[in-house]
Amino acid sequence: MTGINKNRRIAIACQGGGSHTAFTAGVLKTFLKQKEYSIVALSGASGGAICALLAWYGLLMRERDLGVELLDSFWKDNSASSMGEILLNDWMVWVAGLRSTMVMPEFSPYLYPSWAQDEVKRMLEKHVEFEKIEKLVQPSSPMLVVGAVDVLSGEFKVFKNAQVTADAILASAAVPTLFRAVQMGNGLYWDGLFSQNPPIRDLPDADPDEIWVVQIDPHRRKVEPKTVAEIQDRRNELAGNLSLNQEIYFIEKINELVNRKLLVGSKYKFINVRRIEMSRDLDYASKLDRSSSFIQELMAYGEEQAEDFLKTGTDHPRIQGQSPVLAGQRG
């Protein structure tokens, strides 16, 4: 086996998935350490958007090692550490597990204070100086794309580069059963899981040679789900992959048009789309698990999978083979 060709322009798309995106943090840490690859764009939804932001900010500061440090630091801060946090975390995971096996009352996030969202915003602003981003972004800078959905209009919303604020990240991570919708301008936004999970069709604007998708929800399962819990978990996985598949379908349609010579010109190119998949059998409730041991385990697993991907990349599963897409202008 041979690894991924070096000196290539790479765009990385990070699927959302709550605490499972600690796996994504591990993957990105490994990619940031490999300076042979030029990361020209990152995108993400929900927890994937947070990871993409932290890695992108390090690239903006021209310090890949800073991106690694930010990913480590954020997930350490996000882990349940105090006795109160540990007890609350264990209770939430337990309740989430019960909901997959029995009917339980649901509570609107508007019935209790938004302290959880406030804490996430505090952590984001601790790690990223958002007020600096507009001046840091240059035509040659890597691109960041974050997805959310407008609750009222149903329209997908994409935040790019300097448009990405702490509130934009909160909007992309606003799971409606847990968090209130986020008001931005005239829009009211929910989690990016309902729009583009993750955004992919915008990435060709950065003119990458390849798009690497960090996938949290598995495409395939080996065993038929039969219990209520298994059925609920598989339903959630399929829902999480719905928008991802739509994004890939968009690329495949362009592929078809180019192969039929209906689209011609130098602005079209082939872009390999590859997948780095978290293949562990985890249930939906564990997406809420913020225990330190679980977070560290997933990050280590992400690093391991990323290293394997770089070593065996040419044989690693591709998503629908090679796809020609509209290529953007290089900065």
Which residue ranges define each predicted feature?
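FAD-binding core of FAD-dependent oxidoreductases
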Residues: 49-51
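Patatin-like phospholipase
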Residues: 1-43, 53-331
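Catalytic nucleophile serine of serine hydrolases
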Residues: 46
